[in-house]
Structure formats: structure tokens, C-alpha cells
Amino acid sequence: MRLLALSLSLSLLACRSRDESDPETWIRRLDDRDAKIRVQAVQQLRKLKAKQAAREVAALLKDPLVKEDAALALEDLGGRGQVDALLDAVDTTVGAGSDAAARAANRTNARIAEALGNIGDPRAGPALLRLARATDDTVRLAAVEALGNVKASEAIPELSHIVDDAAAPPLLIKRALVALGQIGDPAAIPALTHGLVIERQGVSFLPESSFALFLIGAPAVEPLMKIAQDQDPGYLAWAKENNRAPAGTYAKTALVLGDIEDARAVPVLLAKLKYVDSDPVPGTSRLLSNLVKMFAANALGRMRAVEAGPAIQALVSTINPQDEDLTTLAAEALSWLGDRAQARELMKKAQKGLVKQRIVVAQAAALFGEPALGNELATLATRESKGSPPACVRQLGELALSVDDPRQACGLLAAQFSELAKPLDAARVCGAEAPCWLMRMQDPDPDVRARASYELGRAGSAAAVPMLAGAAADEQLLVRAAATRALDWLAAVPAAQPALKGIAPQLASQLAQEQGKTRFLKANEELRRLQVKLSRL
């Protein structure tokens, strides 16, 4: 008898457990007389992702004791059928009060805005626009984000006002810029160009503004070119009023023009390679001039504007430490252009000067130069190995390297150059054979993997797409950058486009997983743009 009772108890517990995982159990409790049970039912349905309960949950928006939880649940459960109920539930009378009722009403309005944004129905635009003007910051943040999700073009004036409002919180400005990009209307371009250069409370909005302009794409090219050439009177007046330096404007417009990759911008960018800032302090003038030049060079490299090669080469210097960043970006741009003659010029410059810049230049040359450059690297390394130990120790220090025995310093310094011969050795073996370069994608040396990525991209190898997609997640930033560029180049190859579109979800997943990882921040900004480009194929 005791065993029978125990068996019956266990059976009842199992049934109860199964019942609580069944949405119907909780749907039946939504009209319970006890408000606590109704709230619990809504919460459980949200946990169970029971979208079939959306209609019943939406009905509880009229229940003041359950309204907030119902709105929260509809963020996950709601669909177009719940839009009207959510709109009716918006409290347009609440202010920014600190009493419990006002706080609850504002929390509920924020959750309604989030639910409407997640649903993405344009009918929500007018209500969200009203909420974007609320006095409560939480409500405004949720509403502004939702306006982007529903692509409410009628909100562009309000969102633009937020961007230009000096009193607006930085986070709200960021949300407004993102929303303008999602809406994708060229009417947002003036506000977005302001966003490129403004700062609020020490916060830059360049990432959000540049990406939003990238999303708008071709319609942004002419306005950006006019700004870069001081041909937009409205922008000039705004920049003067807001004390925005020309160099920052030129550099950041060049950045976006490079993202969009529209050939119309090439002449404008070529002109910026010769920019000289008018600041009376020579050091500041050089710094600002270099800023504009390196962004212009980077943009021309992205666009593979081969005609820019000699002008970009002229920016490469191993002599002045102030030119380190400019040299790095210019050398990288030359590796993207892929003109082998420019690699020979880079290797000549690597023969003398500051060691950090020499290695940057030699590495760039090794990523696209002819195999014969390996002989020059070997000669260079031999010369370094015969240097004086004190000089070698000093140069290793500039590279953040150390050695216990100074007598070994010159050997270690020479190795920094000789190691760069590996991608040139691979080029000697592979030549223009894509299958050979595909095998090199698994090479233990990151320089070889980077060179293989570039070679496959230049060759238009559709078969390389899966391997390159994997390399876009490589731990080495050099390899990531090369794989991202190669995939971008392949987007112009019709045979590669189906495979490229197929990897867009994979790249989106990678971006989500790596969000917040500062080491990959810059690389993933590039990958983010690539993912959008591929998803649009």
C-alpha cells in the first residue's frame, strides 16, 4: 500500500511538472481572480516563448495590476496582431514624476515601445514618435530605438534634432544615429554628417554615424564629396558655429567614402593625399595633415584604385616617428591595390630608417610582392645580424622586445626581417595557382595565411569562400583583415555571390558572439560592413 501511494505521488508530481511546461496550463491562469497568479502566468508564458498566447496576454494590457508584465512579455511574444492593443495601452498623460505610479507608467511605456520595435510594424510610428519626446529618459531611449526598427521616416526630423541637441544624453544620441541608419532615408544625411564629428561629454559618435551612412550607401556619396571639398554652405556654417576642425571632417568623410566604395569619390580622395593643414604649430599641422592623408589612402586602398598607387607610395616614410600611423595605413593600402611594382618600392624603403616603420613596410611588401623580394629580405637580415649589439638592443626595445644576452640581440633583430620571407617563399611555390593558396590558408604562419587570403581574393576564387569565412574569425588580426578584404573583393565575382550570401548568417553569428571583445573591435567594424554587403547580394 505504501509503495502504491509513493508511486501515485511521483506520478502526480511528474504530471504537474509536465503541466507547468505546457503553455495551456498558464493560458488558463491568465484570468485567475488572484493578480499574483495572473502575473506569474504572464511571466511563465514569456519564459516558454509561447507566442500562441500573445492575444490573451495583450488583453491583460487593460489590467492595471498586470499591464507592465504583459507589455514586457509582448516584447518576445507579440506580433502584428497585438499592435493595436499595445498602441491603446500607451499612457500619454504620464510625466517624469518620481512617485511609484509615475515610475511604473514610464516603465510600462518603455516596454510597450520595445515591444512595438521588436514587432516592427510601421503603424507604431506616430505613437513611438510621441514617446520619443517624453520627459523620461528610459522611455525616450526605448522609443528612439524602436523608431529605427519600424523604419519610421516621419521621425527623421525628431531624430536629427536629438543628434544636434547639445543637452541630449550621449546614449540617446547614439540610439538616434543608429535609428537614422536603419530608416535609411537620405533625408537623414545632414544629421549623420554632423554625427561624424561631434562629441558630447567626451563621447565620439563616429562608429554609429559612419555605419549609418554606409547603410544609406550611394545617395550619401555626393553630399559627402561636397563636404570634403567645402562645397556645402550649410555644413560649413554648422561646422564654424560648432568649432569643428576641417581636418576631422575631411578624414571622416574619407572613411565613409571608402566604406561605400563608390568610384565617383576617387578624384576627391586623391586630392586629400596632398592635404596640408593650416594650423600655425608645425607639429600640429603635421599631425592633422597625416590624419587626412591616411584616411584618404585607406579609402583608396579599399576601392582598389590602382591609379592612386604612386601618390600613396609617396606617403610611406621610415624616417620620422610622427609618420608611423600614416606609413602603416599607406603601406596597407598598397597591399590592397596589389601593384607588384609598389612592393619593390616598399622594400627599398625598408632598408633604412626607424626599425618599427621598416618592419611595417617590409611586411606589407611581403604580402603582395614578387618572390624575388625574398632575396632582398635575406640580404637585409644578414646586414642586421652584423650590426653592433648596443644598436640592436636599442632597436629591439623600440619593438618592445628584449634579450638576456646582448650578443644575441642582432640575431634576434635580423630574425624580425627574415621571418617575413615566408609569404614570399609561398608565392614562389604557388604562383597564381588557387588550389595551392587554399592549402596555404592552413599554414601556421599568419603572414602566409594573410598572403593566401589576398591572393585568393585577387584571383576571384569562388571556391575559397568557405575557407576565407573561417579566416575572418582568425585569432590573428592581420589574417582577419586580409580575409575580410578578400571576401569583399569576391562580392564582385558573380560565381562567388551565392556562396557569399550563404555565409552572411555565419558572419552575423560571429559578430554577435564577439560583441564587446575590444581586441576585435576594429576588425569587426569591417566585418560588420561586409556582412551587410553580403546579405544584400
Set out the residue ranges of the language-model regions.
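Substrate-recognition/specificity elements adjacent to catalytic centers across diverse enzyme folds
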Residues: 310
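Bacterial Sec signal peptide processing site at the extreme N-terminus
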Residues: 16-28
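Alpha-solenoid HEAT/Armadillo-like helical repeat scaffolds in large eukaryotic proteins
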Residues: 25-29, 56-64, 85-100, 127-135, ...
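Structural detector for internal amphipathic alpha-helices that build alpha-solenoid repeat scaffolds
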Residues: 15-19, 36-50, 56-59, 67-80, ...
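Sec-dependent N-terminal signal peptides of Gram-negative exported proteins
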Residues: 1-16
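HEAT/armadillo-like alpha-solenoid scaffolds in large eukaryotic assembly and transport factors
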Residues: 497-500
